[in-house]
Every structure is written in C-alpha cells, then in structure tokens.
C-alpha cells in the first residue's frame, strides 16, 4: 500500500508542470484571441502567429523620417504588451543620448516605457506598454484598452521623431528633455469624441501625456 501511494504521489507531482503549462497556454490563447478580435474590428492588415501568441502589423506614421511604425502585440498568461518601434534603425552614435533622453522622459510618463533595443546588431527606438489582464475575466475595459493604448503608443512615437531629430542635430539629452518639458505643458483632461481618430481607431478615454510640437 505504501509503495502504491508513493507511486501515485510521484505521478501526481509529475503531472503538475504539464497541467501548469496547459493552463498557461489556455490563458495565452484567451488573451491572443482578445487581441485578434480587437484588431480585426478596425480592419487592419496584420500577420498573426498563433503558435507564439504574437501579432504584427506595420503602420504609416505622419512623421516618418525615422521610418514607419512596426507594431508587435504579445499575449502572455496574465498580460499583453504593445510594442511600437520605428522601421529604420538609429544611428549608433546617437544611442547614448537617446537612451539618456528616454530615461528622463520615462520618469514622467503615465504609462509605458521608451527604450532603445538592439536587434541583429542594429539599434531601434521603441515604446512598450504593458497591460495586466485576467484571462478568465476579460472585460470591456480590457478590450477597449487594446486600441486606446495602441493609438497612444503611435502618437508617442510620432512625437518622439522631433526630439530624436534634435539629438541628431547635435542637441544634448538634457536640452532635448527641457524642450519636451516645455512642449508638454499641463496635462489635458481626456475628452470623448465621436467617430475615429487619425489612426482609424475608435476614440476612448485615454491619458494625454504628449502634445505635438
């Protein structure tokens, strides 16, 4: 009897990682499906990879001297991320000053993080937003946040073009951050508008953290 109990215990313990992985996969699938549904609602061309729970799309920015936007959505077991980067790499000589500027701006942002990432030995400026979501209780608020924060991320990257250009023209991170502070002014109260914004996304109540220069 003791041997049988021991064997059953070993089998039960062996199944725990398998069950945990299955639960994680189901949670990721739920959040991936949410992302897919919301993005399909605005009729955007996208590439979806169900195996990695990732969705990719390209988007033309109003200001594209640094390239257009590469947007990547990733679904995890308890969160989704929205990552927007420029399609053109940064000049490596600018990287230290851009990182310094981004670090200063990040300390003031309401949501998300500006960063410089390295891929295939080239550097890209990016902005990432992390959204915590309960995969077993996805609310309308969670769904609305997908498009609302995608629009916010795109607006942020449009605004950053001018500041990165100033750095490319020889301004220091300190001076460019001072420009950003002067531009941002007082935080505006969010307003609900009818119709769709310039990205084609339905408008939502989102924090306005950047003002166009």
Question: What would you call each of these model-derived segments?
Answer:
Residues 163-193:
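Short, highly charged C-terminal tails/helix-capping segments
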Residues 18-24:
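Sec-dependent signal peptide cleavage junction
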Residues 1-4:
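Positively charged n-region of N-terminal signal peptides that target proteins for export
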Residues 8-16:
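Bacterial N-terminal signal peptides
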């Amino acid at each position: 009897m003791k041997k049988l109990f021991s064997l059953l215990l070993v089998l039960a313990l062996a199944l725990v990682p398998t069950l945990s992985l299955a639960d994680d996969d189901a949670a990721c699938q739920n959040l991936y499906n949410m992302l897919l549904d919301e993005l399909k609602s605005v009729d955007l061309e996208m590439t979806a990879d169900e195996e990695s729970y990732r969705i990719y799309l390209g988007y033309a920015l109003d200001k594209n001297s640094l390239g257009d936007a590469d947007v990547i959505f990733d679904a995890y077991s308890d969160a989704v991320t929205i990552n927007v980067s420029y399609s053109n790499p940064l000049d490596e000589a600018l990287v230290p000053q851009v990182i310094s500027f981004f670090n200063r701006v990040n300390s003031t942002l309401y949501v998300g993080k500006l960063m410089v990432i390295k891929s295939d030995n080239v550097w890209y400026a990016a902005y990432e937003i992390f959204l915590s979501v309960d995969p077993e209780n996805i609310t309308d608020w969670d769904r609305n946040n997908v498009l609302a924060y995608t629009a916010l991320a795109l607006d942020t990257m449009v605004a950053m073009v001018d500041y990165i250009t100033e750095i490319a023209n020889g301004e220091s991170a300190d001076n460019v951050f001072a420009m950003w502070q002067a531009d941002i002014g007082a935080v505006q109260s969010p307003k609900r508008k009818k119709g769709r914004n310039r990205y084609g996304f339905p408008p939502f109540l989102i924090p306005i953290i950047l003002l166009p220069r």
